[in-house]
Amino acid sequence: PKGIIVGDYYSGQKVFDGGYEAYAEVVVNNGEIVHIELNERPPLTYYASEWAGETKRRSGYGFFQAKSPRTDYTLVTLINGMSYLEWQVLKNQKLDFEYKTLFGSSNSARNGFVPLLKEMSKEVQGKTSNKRYVGITQPYDSGISTRLEVIYENGKIVDLKYDEIFADDKKDIKNKTLQEFYR
């Protein structure tokens, strides 16, 4: 996301397939879904110990998965699959519909994200949340964007997140020592 996003905040979590956790955050402003972000955390027993118990979305997991021989065949990573589901939600402006999934990330979608989003649909469509979301993302010419997210509940800050998001392409990052961190 770029710019400023404001709205009612909804979040959910679902445990699936022996300990994987699917997460969803949805922001609605004046009846319109303006932001959605999915994430996944594998169990502590995950076969690749460096990712066991760690969220995958904005980590090096996408690079790890892209190096897998299986990915050579599918050309899809979990992050691609999450982005595709998010795009469908924003396009359809609802959470409860027939999702399409990408081969190579469909287990997480079918067993985690899609059931979670369908469970959340009644809450998101049914009532105003007592949590508010303010997110600001500012891109810079350096190839790095800063992102600040603040979640309020009853007028008090209950969560605060800050992240620096590196460009998708190494050459867009001006500082050579930071180029290895491209998305």
Task: Label the model's feature ranges.
Residues 1-6, 12-130, 134-183:
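Active-site- and interface-proximal helix/loop "cap" or "latch" segments in soluble metabolic
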